[in-house]
UniProtKB/Swiss-Prot annotation:
This is Antigen peptide transporter 1. It comes from Homo sapiens. Inhibited at high ER lumenal peptide concentrations. (Microbial infection) Inhibited by herpes simplex virus US12/ICP47 protein, which blocks the peptide-binding site of TAP1-TAP2. It is found in: Endoplasmic reticulum membrane. One of its GO terms (cellular component) is phagocytic vesicle membrane. The chain crosses the membrane at residues 16-36, 54-76, 93-113, 134-154, 187-207, 228-248, 299-319, 329-349, 419-439, 444-464. GO terms for molecular function: ABC-type peptide antigen transporter activity; ADP binding; ATP binding; ATP hydrolysis activity; metal ion binding; MHC class I protein binding; MHC class Ib protein binding; peptide antigen binding. The record marks D32 as: Inter-subunit salt bridge with TAPBP. It is an enzyme of class 7 (translocase). Disulfide bonds: none annotated. Its EC number is 7.4.2.14. Signal peptide: none annotated. The peptide-binding site is shared between the cytoplasmic loops of TAP1 and TAP2.
Length: 748
C-alpha cells in the first residue's frame, strides 16, 4: 500500500511535526495580535451603532473566536497523523481550540460582567468603555491573561472525556455517568448542595471585610452583632450542607458500585465458553471485584474532593471578579509562576534524590564486593585500592548531597517566594485602589482571604486531578468486559410445548478456537433417539467430552449441523434448551449453598420439596442427605469439599433429573458412585418408565452400563470407527472388542 505521505521535492527540507506545530501556533497568535486586534474593531465600528457598545464587543469577540478556531483547526490538521516525532506536541495542541474560545469570549464576558455589577451606577459606562473596545492593548493583554488559565482548565477537564484507545470502550466519563441510571437526580442534588455550601463557606471572608470596615468607621454595636450572627448562621449552614452532600454522594457511589459490579458480572456470564478457558478465573474476578471496587473507592474519595474544590474555585473566581477585576487578573497571571515553577524545581529535586540513592547503592556494592572477596583482595595487596575506590564513591555521594541540599533550598524558596510575591502584588495594587477610593479596606481584606482560598483550591485540584484521571482511565478495563461481544450465537426463540428429544449429528466437525488447525471431531454422523441409550466409548482424547459439550451448545461446530427435533441447536431459547438438555460430568460443580438449592439450581420456578426428594432418590443422593443433621437444608461450602466425589455426582445427577429433560448426557458421571448408587443409575437408565421419554448419551468407564446400551459408538481420533450393539461389536472383534479384552484401556 502506498504511503500516505507524499515525497518531498528534491532540495526541500520538510519541517518536523513538532516544529510545524510550534510555527503554526506562533503565526496564529501573531496574526491575532497584529491583524485581528485592529481589523475587527474597525470593521464592526461600521456595522454596529456606537450606541450599542456591548453588542459591538460581542460581535468582535465571536468573530475573533471563529477566525482563531479555523486557524487552530488548520494547525491541528497539519500535524494530525504524524508519528512519534510530534507525539509530545499533540498534548498541548489539543488546548488550541479551547484557547481560541477563551480568547474570543474573555473580553465580551468580562464586559457583560462589568455591566451587570455596575448596573445603574453613575459613570459606569465610562469605567468599562476601554474593555468594550478590543483594539486597546491593555484589554487585549487582559484577554490573554484570562484565556490561558481558562484554556488550560478546559483542556484538563476535557481530557477526562476523551474516547478510549484502539479497541477501547468509548468515552469513559460518559460511560460512568451512564452507570448512574436513576441516581442522576441524586448527583444533581449533590452538585446543588456543593454550590450552596461553597457560597456559605465564603461568608467568613465577606463578613471579615465588613467587620474591618466597621472597625475603621467606628460603627455601632448592633451592626457588629448582626454581621457576626449572619456569618455564624451561614458558616453552620455551609457545614450542614457539606455533611448532607457528602452523605448523598457516598450513598450514590455505593449504588453505582453495586450496579456496575452487577453489570460487569452479567457481561462476563454472557461470554462464550472459550473466553473462560483463555482467561484465568483469578483475572476475571479481579476485574469484576477488585477493579470495580478500586474505581468506586477512588471516585468516592478523589472525585468528591475534585468536585468540591472545582465548584469552590469557580465560585471564588466569580466573587473575586465581582470584587475587583484588576486584582483577579493579577492572581490569574501569577498562578503559573505560583505552581509551575515549584513543580519544575521539585522534579529536579526528586531526580537528585534518585541519583543519591543509586550512588549509595553503588558505594555499598563496592564495600560488599571487597569484603566478600577479602582473600583475593589481600592476595593481590589491593586493600588501599579498594579503600580509594570506596572514597571516590563517597565523594560522588557528597557532591550529590550538596546539589540535593541546594535543590531543596531552591524548592522551598520558590514555593514561599512565589506565594509572597503574589501577596505583595495584590497588597500593592489593592493599596492603590484603597487610596484612590475604588475599594474599601474591608473589601481588600475580603479579596485577600478569597485569593488565599482560591489558591488553595487550585493547588488541591492540581494534586487530585492525576488521581481522578487515573481512576477514569482504569474504568476502560471494566468497560472492555461490558463492551465485549460474545462469540457464541445469540439465544434463539424456539420454545415448543413438546420436544421429543431426537438428536442428529450431521457431518459434524469441530476444532477448538485456540487451535483452529487441529480437528478434534471429523465428520461425525449419528442419531440419539428417544427411549434409547447411546453409549460413546473410545480411548482418552478421542473427543467424547467434546461431543457432550457440543450437545450442550457450549461450542458451535466448525462444520456440519447439530439438530434437535430437526432444528439447529442455537435456534432454541437459551433457558428452554438447558431445561430440555441436562448434563452431568465427571467432576460436577457444587455451589456454596444448601443441598436443596443445589438440586433446584437454575430452575425459574421453585420446585416443591417432594420433587426435590424424588430426584434425589432416583440419583442415590437421598440416602446420605437424609442422614445429615439438617438434611436438605445442609449448607455446602464453596467447592463442595465436605462432600465426597460420589456424593457430588449424586447431587449433580439429581439436579439434572429434576428438570425431566428430553436429552440426558452422562459424561463419566458415575465414576465415583458406590455400588448401590450405580445400581440405582443402571435401573434409572434401563428399567425406569421415564426412559422412553428421553434420549441418553452415555460416556462411562463401567462396561456393565455400556453392555446394555441400545447403541454403542466407538470414537477414535475424532471419528466413529464402528457402531452397533454390544453383541454385534463383540462379534466383529474390532476396536470395541479389543478395548473390552484390555480392561486397563477401558473407555473413560
Amino acid at each position: 500500500m502506498a504511503s500516505s505521505r507524499c515525497p518531498a521535492p528534491r532540495g526541500c527540507r520538510c519541517l518536523p511535526g513538532a516544529s510545524l506545530a510550534w510555527l503554526g501556533t506562533v503565526l496564529l497568535l501573531l496574526a491575532d495580535w497584529v491583524l485581528l486586534r485592529t481589523a475587527l474593531p474597525r470593521i464592526f465600528s461600521l456595522l454596529v451603532p456606537t450606541a450599542l457598545p456591548l453588542l459591538r464587543v460581542w460581535a468582535v469577540g465571536l468573530s475573533r473566536w471563529a477566525v482563531l478556531w479555523l486557524g487552530a483547526c488548520g494547525v491541528l490538521r497539519a500535524t494530525v497523523g504524524s508519528k512519534s516525532e510530534n507525539a509530545g506536541a499533540q498534548g498541548w495542541l489539543a488546548a488550541l481550540k479551547p484557547l481560541a474560545a477563551a480568547l474570543g469570549l474573555a473580553l465580551p464576558g468580562l464586559a457583560l460582567f462589568r455591566e451587570l455589577i455596575s448596573w445603574g451606577a453613575p459613570g459606569s459606562a465610562d469605567s468599562t468603555r476601554l474593555l468594550h473596545w478590543g483594539s486597546h492593548p491593555t484589554a487585549f493583554v487582559v484577554s490573554y491573561a484570562a484565556a490561558l488559565p481558562a484554556a488550560a482548565l478546559w483542556h484538563k477537564l476535557g481530557s477526562l472525556w476523551v474516547p478510549g484507545g484502539q479497541g477501547g470502550s468509548g468515552n469513559p466519563v460518559r460511560r460512568l455517568l451512564g452507570c448512574l441510571g436513576s441516581e442522576t437526580r441524586r448527583l444533581s442534588l449533590f452538585l446543588v448542595l456543593v454550590v450552596l455550601s461553597s457560597l456559605g463557606e465564603m461568608a467568613i471572608p465577606f463578613f471579615t471585610g465588613r467587620l474591618t470596615d466597621w472597625i475603621l468607621q467606628d460603627g455601632s454595636a448592633d451592626t457588629f452583632t448582626r454581621n457576626l450572627t449572619l456569618m455564624s448562621i451561614l458558616t453552620i449552614a455551609s457545614a450542614v450542607l457539606e455533611f448532607v452532600g457528602d452523605g448523598i454522594y457516598n450513598n450514590t457511589m455505593g449504588h453505582v458500585h453495586s450496579h456496575l459490579q452487577g453489570e460487569v458480572f452479567g457481561a462476563v456470564l454472557r461470554q462464550e465458553t472459550e473466553f473462560f478457558q483463555q482467561n484465568q478465573t483469578g483475572n476475571i474476578m479481579s476485574r469484576v471485584t477488585e477493579d470495580t471496587s478500586t474505581l468506586s473507592d477512588s471516585l468516592s474519595e478523589n472525585l468528591s474532593l475534585f468536585l468540591w474544590y472545582l465548584v469552590r474555585g469557580l465560585c471564588l473566581l466569580g466573587i473575586m471578579l465581582w470584587g475587583s477585576v484588576s486584582l483577579t487578573m493579577v492572581t490569574l497571571i501569577t498562578l503559573p509562576l505560583l505552581f509551575l515553577l515549584p513543580k519544575k524545581v521539585g522534579k529536579w529535586y526528586q531526580l537528585l534524590e534518585v541519583q543519591v540513592r543509586e550512588s549509595l547503592a553503588k558505594s555499598s556494592q563496592v564495600a560488599i564486593e571487597a569484603l566478600s572477596a577479602m582473600p583475593t583482595v589481600r592476595s593481590f595487596a589491593n586493600e588501599e585500592g579498594e579503600a580509594q575506590k570506596f572514597r571516590e564513591k563517597l565523594q560522588e555521594i557528597k557532591t550529590l548531597n550538596q546539589k540535593e541540599a541546594v535543590a531543596y533550598a531552591v524548592n522551598s524558596w520558590t514555593t514561599s517566594i512565589s506565594g509572597m510575591l503574589l501577596k505583595v502584588g495584590i497588597l500593592y495594587i489593592g493599596g492603590q485602589l484603597v487610596t484612590s477610593g475604588a475599594v474599601s479596606s474591608g473589601n481588600l481584606v475580603t479579596f485577600v482571604l478569597y485569593q488565599m482560598q482560591f489558591t488553595q483550591a487550585v493547588e488541591v485540584l492540581l494534586s487530585i486531578y492525576p488521581r481522578v484521571q487515573k481512576a477514569v482511565g482504569s474504568s476502560e478495563k471494566i468497560f472492555e468486559y461490558l463492551d465485549r461481544t460474545p462469540r457464541c450465537p445469540p439465544s434463539g426463540l424456539l420454545t415448543p410445548l413438546h420436544l421429543e428429544g431426537l438428536v442428529q449429528f450431521q457431518d459434524v466437525s469441530f476444532a477448538y478456537p485456540n487451535r483452529p488447525d487441529v480437528l478434534v471431531l471429523q465428520g461425525l454422523t449419528f442419531t440419539l433417539r428417544p427411549g434409547e441409550v447411546t453409549a460413546l466409548v473410545g480411548p482418552n482424547g478421542s473427543g467424547k467430552s467434546t461431543v457432550a459439550a457440543l450437545l450442550q451448545n457450549l461450542y458451535q461446530p466448525t462444520g456440519g449441523q447439530l439438530l434437535l427435533d430437526g432444528k439447529p441447536l442455537p435456534q432454541y431459547e437459551h433457558r428452554y434448551l438447558h431445561r430440555q438438555v441436562a448434563a452431568v460430568g465427571q467432576e460436577p460443580q457444587v455451589f456454596g449453598r444448601s443441598l436443596q438449592e443445589n438440586i433446584a439450581y437454575g430452575l425459574t420456578q421453585k420446585p416443591t420439596m417432594e420433587e426435590i426428594t424424588a430426584a434425589a432418590v432416583k440419583s442415590g443422593a437421598h440416602s446420605f442427605i437424609s442422614g445429615l443433621p439438617q438434611g436438605y437444608d445442609t449448607e455446602v461450602d464453596e467447592a463442595g469439599s465436605q462432600l465426597s466425589g460420589g456424593q457430588r455426582q449424586a447431587v449433580a445427577l439429581a439436579r439434572a433429573l429434576i428438570r425431566k429433560p428430553c436429552v440426558l448426557i452422562l459424561d463419566d458421571a458415575t465414576s465415583a458412585l458406590d455400588a448401590n448408587s450405580q445400581l440405582q443409575v443402571e435401573q434409572l437408565l434401563y428399567e425406569s418408565p421415564e426412559r422412553y421419554s428421553r434420549s441418553v448419551l452415555l460416556i462411562t468407564q463401567h462396561l456393565s452400563l455400556v453392555e446394555q446400551a441400545d447403541h454403542i459408538l466407538f470414537l477414535e481420533g475424532g471419528a466413529i470407527r464402528e457402531g452397533g450393539t454390544h453383541q454385534q461389536l463383540m462379534e466383529k472383534k474390532g476396536c470395541y472388542w479389543a478395548m473390552v479384552q484390555a480392561p486397563a484401556d477401558a473407555p473413560e
